[in-house]
Amino acid sequence: MKVQEYISSRREGRPLHFTLLDPGKTSANDLITLAKQTAEAGTDGFMVGGSTDLSLENVDLAVETIKQTTHMPVILFPTHASSVSGKADAIFFMSLLNSESRQFLVGVQIASAPWVKKT
């Protein structure tokens, strides 16, 4: 099932909850524990990201760990183009609209486009 279909089917009549897990601040063992606990508590899926210094390897490992632990979608919450992983189920393609910096308004999105297209 595609992530969009999953979200649409889950949100009928209720709000959804997605847990943000930051591989820059959480060990692999803690990711397993947190994924299990939040899945049991009723989260609808997971977002991976947060820290600005994440490597692709850290993001890939986090996504793989969460997907092996649960059967819920893993959506990237990227802070930089270099942390776009093809192992995730989806990506939030965001734009920071309250910035005066062109880099944050469109630059990062332009830099991310080739990675998104590849995956």
Question: Which sequence ranges carry the predicted segments?
Answer:
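Hydrophobic faces of well-ordered beta-strands that scaffold small-molecule active sites
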Residues: 17-22, 46-48, 74-76, 91-93
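Conserved anion-binding
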Residues: 83-119
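N-terminal amphipathic alpha-helix/helix-capping segment at the start of soluble metabolic enzymes
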Residues: 1-21, 25, 113-118
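Short, acidic/polar
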Residues: 25-38, 79
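Glycine-rich, proline-tolerant flexible connector loops at the mouths of alpha/beta enzymes
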Residues: 47-61
